From Swiss-Prot:
Its EC number is 2.7.7.-, 6.1.1.6. It is found in: Cytoplasm, Cytosol; Cytoplasm; Nucleus; Cell membrane. Its main location: cytoplasm. It is likely that the same gene provides both this cytoplasmic isoform and an additional mitochondrial isoform. This is Lysine--tRNA ligase. The modification Phosphoserine is found at residues 236, 424, 619, 623, 625. It comes from Rattus norvegicus (Rat). The keyword DNA damage does not apply. Substrate binds at residues 306, 330, 368, 370, 526, 530. The lineage of its organism: Eukaryota, Metazoa, Chordata, Craniata, Vertebrata. It catalyses: tRNA(Lys) + L-lysine + ATP = L-lysyl-tRNA(Lys) + AMP + diphosphate. GO terms for molecular function: amino acid binding; ATP binding; ATP:ADP adenylyltransferase activity; identical protein binding; lysine-tRNA ligase activity; protein homodimerization activity; scaffold protein binding; tRNA binding. Signal peptide: none annotated.
């Protein structure tokens, strides 16, 4: 009977306990008395005693868990209650809240906002009319004298709270920031529309909140320009604990993944993107004045053309076919020149399925233009005028200082004073290597490829397969010529084997009328006199197709539509392209391309620990895009 009663007791306990909970308890109880020991061959009294021990242990364990849970909840409730009390009775500063764990802070802040909604207050109003920007306010009233208070002028401003300081219960200071400037809000109960509302609004506001302020311009006795509010409105509460400006936001992973937070806390980031915008604006204005027409071309193409690069592939459901993301807009531009639009340009995104490193991002911005009745000599002059004028317009000088290894590394002076240095690729390579290369007319032979291969091996210059002549030359140029280019330098007259879209050199057989502009060892521009012979163009496309078949993923496809367009006649034309991102890096002294992209490509956080970074070399031939 006792055994049956015990079994009923156990079954009752099982009914009250979920199987998941029972499984956990069984595992823990098994350490005291495993169920496998409760065997029928033991005497009944032993089995009864063992079962009692187990039930007693299970009960103690359950009581212990309940106490721990109750204690944790009690501590959290006490913390929440204390913080909630501070939220309404701490002179509005909320300093104690900022000692909390960020998760607790978020919970408390969310509850406070929910309470506002329940009470009928809208913490997210639809509209707040702003009379004057913070920048304009500072410009117009900075002349005030200490102690001035213009009670006859009432203005409305808005911004984000970055600091909150109480000087007693009736005087609270806020640092309001926006547009890269700071304005102090001097909230005094005497000037507010009512004492009760003064207390209420200041108890609500926290660092990070976006607020609207209606008040009078003034200056404190210490000379701090301020707005003295008659009324303040919560426009959008910040639910997260905002890092203090004193410490800033320095972690790069957080900065790149949460760019909005980076912009809130780091004004230098805002300045970089202002400079980026100025660069694009200057280029547009420069080309517009030369009579160029800005155009837009497709970003998804049946054939990826215009550059030697590996494309991204997507799929079009309706057409039931693969499409390629644009690697360069060049071929479309030249078709438009065939159609009679003699000067065209486009500023836009390109996509290349290649490596991510300090100077490469799979999605990047370029400017390309094509100019009928011009050659690469004309484009060198235009490049010098554009870049030197841009640098001087934005920085005030032709010379800039750049830190390629970061702020703590060595500083270099880059001089954009025209004219820029010019070197011929093959001649300079022979000079630096101290060897005589085969005649450029023989660069397409296997003998030349073997000579270049041997030079790379002897000089320990790495070149992953396929070790084609074009790739070997590109590696040698990168190793021995590009590294000498600190101030702007044109590397000119590339071999035809490296430039399937460029026109052959009018004086040097085997070469093309092409140049690349390097600054601080990095390519920023690429341009050439365009090949407009449809027969020769088709031959070069076929050679590229052979290279692709041999394993070169970056080799070009044959574009029949483009070849057909050339058959209608492309006038003598020169084409040019520049990487906006790299130019921005130099003018903002940034050594990482992620610093000048608002939302750079990043590995998913759960993969960043295990994924290995890959580095892909720059293309040996681009459209004039880089």
């Amino acid at each position: 009977m006792l055994m049956q009663a015990a079994v009923r007791l156990v079954r009752g306990s099982l009914r009250q306990t979920s199987w998941a909970e029972w499984g956990q308890r069984e595992l823990r109880l098994g350490q005291l008395a495993p169920f496998t020991t409760l065997r029928k061959d033991k005497p009944l009294s032993d089995r009864r005693s063992e079962l009692k021990r187990r039930l007693k242990a299970e009960k103690k364990l359950a009581e212990k868990e309940a106490k721990q849970k109750e204690l944790s909840e009690k501590q959290l409730n006490q913390t929440t209650a204390a913080a909630a009390t501070n939220h309404t009775a701490d002179n509005g500063v909320g300093a104690e809240e900022e000692t909390l764990d960020p998760n607790q802070y978020y919970k408390i802040r969310s509850q406070a906002v929910q309470q506002l909604k329940v009470s009928g207050e809208d913490p997210y109003p639809h509209k707040f009319h702003v009379d004057i920007s913070l920048t304009q306010f500072i410009q117009e009233y900075s002349h005030l004298q200490p102690g001035d208070h213009l009670t006859d002028i009432t203005l409305k401003v808005a911004g984000r709270i970055h600091a909150k300081r109480a000087s007693g219960g009736k005087l609270i200071f806020y640092d309001l920031r926006g547009e890269g400037v700071k304005l102090q809000v001097m909230a005094n109960s005497r000037n507010y529309k009512s004492e009760e509302e003064f207390v209420h609004i200041n108890n609500k506001l926290r660092r990070g909140d976006i607020i609207g302020v209606e008040g009078n311009p003034g200056k404190t006795k210490k000379g701090e320009l301020s707005i003295v509010p008659r009324e303040m409105t919560l426009l959008s509460p910040c639910l997260h604990m905002l890092p203090h400006l004193h410490f800033g936001l320095k972690d790069k992973e957080t900065r790149y993944r949460q760019r909005y937070l980076d912009l809130i806390l780091n004004d230098f980031v805002r300045q970089k993107f202002i400079i980026r915008s100025k660069i694009i604006t200057y280029i547009r204005s420069f080309l517009d004045e030369l009579g160029f027409l800005e155009i837009e071309t497709p970003m998804m193409n049946i054939i990826p053309g215009g550059a030697v690069a590996k494309p991204f592939i997507t799929y079009h459901n309706e057409l039931d076919m693969n499409l390629y993301m644009r690697i360069a807009p060049e071929l479309y531009h030249k078709m438009l020149v065939v159609g009679g639009i003699d000067r065209v340009y486009e500023i836009g995104r390109q996509f290349r399925n290649e490596g991510i490193d300090l100077t490469h991002n799979p999605e990047f911005t370029t400017c390309e233009f094509y100019m009928a009745y011009a050659d690469y000599h004309d484009l060198m002059e235009i490049t010098e005028k554009m870049l030197s004028g841009m640098v001087r317009s934005i920085t005030g000088s032709y010379k800039i200082t750049y830190h390629p290894d970061g702020p703590e590394g060595q500083a270099y002076e880059i001089d954009f004073t025209p004219p820029f240095r010019r070197i011929s690729m093959v001649e300079e390579l022979e000079k630096v290597l101290g060897v005589k290369l085969p005649e450029t007319s023989l660069f397409e032979t296997e003998e030349t490829r073997k000579i270049l291969d041997d030079i790379c091996v002897a000089r320990a210059v790495e070149c992953p397969p396929p070790r084609t002549t074009a790739r070997l030359l590109d590696k040698l140029v990168g190793e021995f010529l590009e590294v000498t280019c600190i101030s702007p330098t044109f590397i000119c007259d590339h071999p035809q084997i490296m430039s399937p879209l460029a026109k052959w050199h009018r004086c040097k057989e085997g070469l093309t009328e092409r140049f690349e502009l390097f600054v601080m060892k990095k390519e920023i521009c690429n341009a050439y006199t365009e090949l407009n012979d449809p027969v020769r163009q088709r031959q070069l496309f076929e050679e590229q197709a052979k290279a692709k078949a041999a394993g070169d993923d970056e080799a070009m496809f044959i574009d029949e539509n483009f070849c057909t367009a050339l058959e209608y006649g492309l006038p003598p034309t020169a084409g040019w392209g520049m990487g906006i991102d790299r130019v921005t890096m130099f003018l903002t002294d940034s050594n990482n391309i992620k610093e000048v992209l608002l939302f750079p490509a990043m590995k998913p956080e759960d993969k960043k620990e295990t994924a290995t970074a890959t580095e892909t070399p720059e293309s040996t031939e681009a459209s004039p895009s880089v």
